[in-house]
From Swiss-Prot:
Family affiliation: Belongs to the LZTS family.
Coiled-coil annotated spans: 255-573
Region annotation (Disordered) ranges: 135-190
Pfam families to which the protein is assigned, alphabetical: Fez1
Superkingdom of source: Eukaryota
Tissue specificity: Highly expressed in brain, in particular in cortex, the CA2 region of the hippocampus, olfactory bulb, striatum and pons. Not detectable in the other tissues tested.
Modifications after synthesis and translation: Phosphorylated on serine residues. Hyperphosphorylated by the cAMP-dependent kinase PKA during cell-cycle progression.
Biased composition annotated in UniProt, kind: Basic and acidic residues: 153-162
Species of provenance: Rattus norvegicus
Primary role: Involved in the regulation of cell growth. May stabilize the active CDC2-cyclin B1 complex and thereby contribute to the regulation of the cell cycle and the prevention of uncontrolled cell proliferation. May act as tumor suppressor.
InterPro entries attached to this UniProt entry: LZTS
Name of the molecule in the record: Leucine zipper putative tumor suppressor 1
Compositionally biased spans, kind Polar residues: 174-190
Gene responsible for this protein: Lzts1
Subunit and interaction comment: Binds EEF1G, TLK2 and CDK1.
Species classification: Eukaryota, Metazoa, Chordata, Craniata, Vertebrata
Length: 601
C-alpha cells in the first residue's frame, strides 16, 4: 500500500496521537471547549529542523520496529528566539502566555504593506492556504517558521512566561513502507491543537460555516477510534491515568503489534482520515478564498502606492516584511482572542446573573400571587379609610367653621356685654342720682310734714282762740242785751260806750274769721300738694324699682350666658366634643321677674 506516514508530517501525526489521548481524558468537555481550540489557530509552529542541538528525542530499535524515546527539558533549555508552547489552562488550549492586564505591544507597522522583491503581495498568515498534511501554521522553509513564532524582544526578555511541556519527537527515515515510521504516544508531551479543528477558527471568525466544525468533530472522533488500538496495545495505563506520570520523566514505548489485520485496518482508517482532511481543507480553502480577496487587494493597492512614494522600501528584505506583517497579524489575532475570552467570560457571568434574576423574578411572582388577595384587601381597607378620612376632614372643616362662627359670636357677645356693662354703669349712676334726689325729696317731705304739723297746731290754737272769742262774744251779746234792757233806767253814757264797742268787736271777729279761713285754705293747699308729691314720689319709686329689676335681670342673663360660653370654649380647647356639633343657648333661662328683689330705697 505504500508508506502512509509519508503523506502525513511527523508533527501532525504526533499531535493527532497526543490529541487522541487528550480526547479520551476530557471526552465530556470536548464539545464545550471546541471553539477554544479554534482560537489557538495561527499561534504556534513546530520546528522541523531536528538536526539542531535542541532535539530531545532519541531513537531506538527493537525487533525490526522503531520506537521513540521522548524526554522533556527544563525551561532554560529552550532557545531564546522561540516562544514557549504550553498547554493552556482554558480547557487544554495552547498558546503564548500573555498577561491579560498588559497586552503585548504591537510593532510599528505602517498602513501600507511592504512588498517583496519579486512583486508578490505579502498575504496575511491567517488566510494563507493550508496544506492538507499540517494542522498548524504551514511554512515553506525553516526561516519562515522562525519568523512565524513571536521572537522575544531584547529589551523585555521576561514579558512572556515560558511554560514546560514542549512535545518533541523524531521519526526514522528508514522503513517507509512499514508502520514503524508512525510516532508513538508520548506521555510527557503537552496537548497540541487538533489539526482537524484548526481550520474552524478562521472560518468561524471570518464567516465560515458550522459544517466544517461538525466535520472536524466527526473526523476527530474517528481519529480517537483509530488510535485506541495503539493505546490499548501499550496497556492503556498511560492514557487512563495521565496524572500519575511524572513531569520530565522519559517514557520508552513498547513496539507495535505485528498483527497485519490491525495494521491494514489502521492504514485504511488513516487513509480515510487523510481523505476527509483533504476534503475539509478544500472546503476551508473555498471559504477562505472569498474572505482573503479583500486582504489580497489591499497589498496590491499598497504596492502601487509604495512604488510611487517609497522607492527605497523595495530594498528591504522580504523576510523582515513577512515577519512584521505576521507579528502584527498574530498580535491582532491574540488581542481578538483575548477579547473573545473576556466576552465569553462576561457572557457566562451575564448568563449566571440572568439565571439568578430569573429565579428572583419567579420568587417575586410567587410572592406577588401570594400577596395579591391581601393586597386587594388592604387596598379596599385603604379606600374605606381614605373615605372615612375625607368624611372626617369635611366634618372637621364644618366644626372649624362652626367654632369660628361661635368664636365670632362670642366676640360680638363680649362686645355687647361690654356695651351693656357700660350702659348698666350709666344707669347705676342715674339710679344713684335719682336716689339722692329721692332722698332730698324725702327730706323736703319731712320738712313739709313738720311744717304741716306746726300749721295744724297753730290752727288748733286759732280754733281754740276763736272758740274763746265766740264765747266772749256770746257773753258780750248777753251783757249787751242786759244793758239794753237796763238802758232806759240807767244813765245814757254807759249805753253809748257799749254800743261803740260792739262794731269794733265785730270787725275783730271778722278779721279773725278771715285769717282762719286763709289758714284753712293754706292748710288744704299744703295737704293737697303734699299728697301730690307723695303720689309722684311713689310713681318714681316704682319706676326706679322696675328699671333696677330689669337691669338686674339682663345682667344675670348675660352672666349666665357668658358662663356657658366659657364652659363650651374650655371643652373645645380640651377636644372633648371635637367630632360632635353642639348648640349654645344664647337666650339662656329667663329668670322670673317676681324673683328679682330690688334694692330698698
Amino acid at each position: 500500500m505504500g508508506s502512509v506516514s509519508s503523506l502525513i508530517s511527523g508533527h501532525s501525526l504526533h499531535s493527532k496521537h497526543c490529541r487522541a489521548s487528550q480526547y479520551k481524558l476530557r471526552k465530556s468537555s470536548h464539545l464545550k471547549k471546541l471553539n477554544r481550540y479554534s482560537d489557538g489557530l495561527l499561534r504556534f509552529g513546530f520546528s522541523q529542523d531536528s538536526g539542531r542541538g535542541k532535539s530531545s528525542s532519541k531513537m531506538g530499535k527493537s525487533e525490526d520496529f522503531f520506537y521513540i524515546k521522548v524526554s522533556q527539558k527544563a525551561r532554560g533549555s529552550h532557545r531564546p528566539d522561540y516562544t514557549a508552547l504550553s498547554s493552556g489552562d482554558m480547557g487544554g488550549q495552547t498558546g503564548v502566555d500573555f498577561d491579560p492586564a498588559t497586552p503585548p505591544k504591537l510593532m510599528p507597522f505602517s498602513s501600507q504593506l511592504e512588498m517583496s522583491s519579486d512583486k508578490a503581495a505579502v498575504r496575511p498568515t491567517a488566510f494563507k492556504p493550508v496544506l492538507p498534511r499540517s494542522g498548524a501554521i504551514l511554512h515553506s522553509s525553516p526561516e519562515s517558521t522562525n519568523h512565524q513564532l513571536h521572537p522575544m524582544p531584547p529589551d523585555k526578555p521576561k514579558e512572556q512566561e515560558l511554560k514546560p511541556g514542549l512535545c518533541s519527537g523524531a521519526l526514522s527515515d528508514s522503513g517507509r513502507n512499514s508502520m514503524s515510521s508512525l510516532p508513538t504516544h508520548s506521555t510527557t508531551s503537552s496537548y497540541q491543537l487538533d489539526p482537524l479543528v484548526t481550520p474552524v477558527g478562521p472560518t468561524s471568525r471570518f464567516g465560515g460555516s458550522a459544517h466544517n466544525i461538525t466535520q472536524g468533530i466527526i473526523l476527530q472522533d474517528s481519529n480517537m477510534m483509530s488510535l485506541k488500538a495503539l493505546s490499548f496495545s501499550d496497556g492503556g495505563s498511560k492514557l487512563a491515568h495521565p496524572g500519575k506520570v511524572e513531569k520530565g520523566s522519559s517514557c520508552v514505548r513498547s513496539p507495535l503489534s505485528t498483527d497485519e489485520c490491525t495494521i491494514q485496518e489502521l492504514e485504511q482508517k488513516l487513509l480515510q482520515r487523510e481523505t476527509a482532511l483533504q476534503k475539509l481543507q478544500r472546503s476551508f480553502d473555498e471559504k477562505e478564498f472569498a474572505s482573503g480577496q479583500t486582504f489580497e487587494e489591499r497589498p496590491r493597492r499598497t504596492r502601487d502606492e509604495l512604488e510611487c512614494l517609497e522607492p527605497k522600501s523595495k530594498l528591504k528584505p522580504a523576510s523582515q516584511k513577512s515577519q512584521r506583517t505576521q507579528q502584527v497579524l498574530q498580535l491582532q489575532v491574540l488581542q481578538l482572542q483575548q477579547e473573545k475570552r473576556q466576552l465569553r467570560q462576561e457572557l457566562e457571568s451575564l448568563m449566571k446573573e440572568q439565571d439568578l434574576l430569573e429565579t428572583k423574578l419567579r420568587s417575586y411572582e410567587r410572592e406577588k400571587t401570594n400577596f395579591a388577595p391581601a393586597l386587594e384587601e388592604t387596598q379596599w381597607e385603604v379606600c374605606q379609610k381614605s373615605g372615612e378620612i375625607s368624611l372626617l376632614k369635611q366634618q372637621l372643616k364644618e366644626s372649624q367653621m362652626e367654632v369660628n362662627a361661635k368664636a365670632s359670636e362670642i366676640l360680638s357677645l363680649k362686645a355687647q356685654l361690654k356695651d351693656t356693662r357700660g350702659k348698666l354703669e350709666g344707669m347705676e349712676l342715674k339710679t344713684q342720682d335719682l336716689e339722692s334726689a329721692l332722698r332730698t325729696k324725702g327730706l323736703e317731705l319731712e320738712v313739709c310734714e313738720n311744717e304741716l304739723q306746726r300749721k295744724k297746731n297753730e290752727a288748733e290754737l286759732l280754733r281754740e282762740k276763736v272758740n274763746l272769742l265766740e264765747q266772749e262774744l256770746l257773753e258780750l251779746r248777753a251783757q249787751a242785751a242786759l244793758h239794753r234792757d237796763a238802758a232806759p233806767l240807767g244813765p245814757p253814757g254807759i249805753g253809748l260806750t257799749f254800743s261803740e264797742d260792739i262794731p269794733a268787736l265785730q270787725r275783730e271777729l271778722d278779721r279773725l274769721r278771715a285769717e282762719l279761713k286763709e289758714e284753712r285754705q293754706g292748710h288744704d293747699q299744703m295737704s293737697s300738694g303734699f299728697q301730690h308729691e307723695r303720689l309722684v314720689w311713689k310713681e318714681e319709686k316704682e319706676k326706679v324699682i322696675q328699671y333696677q329689676k330689669q337691669l338686674q335681670q339682663s345682667y344675670l342673663a348675660m352672666y349666665q350666658r357668658n358662663q356657658r360660653l366659657e364652659k363650651a370654649l374650655q371643652q373645645l380647647a380640651r377636644g372633648d366634643i371635637a367630632g360632635e356639633p353642639f348648640e349654645i343657648d344664647l337666650e339662656g333661662a329667663d329668670i322670673p321677674y317676681e324673683d328679682i328683689i330690688a334694692t330698698e330705697i
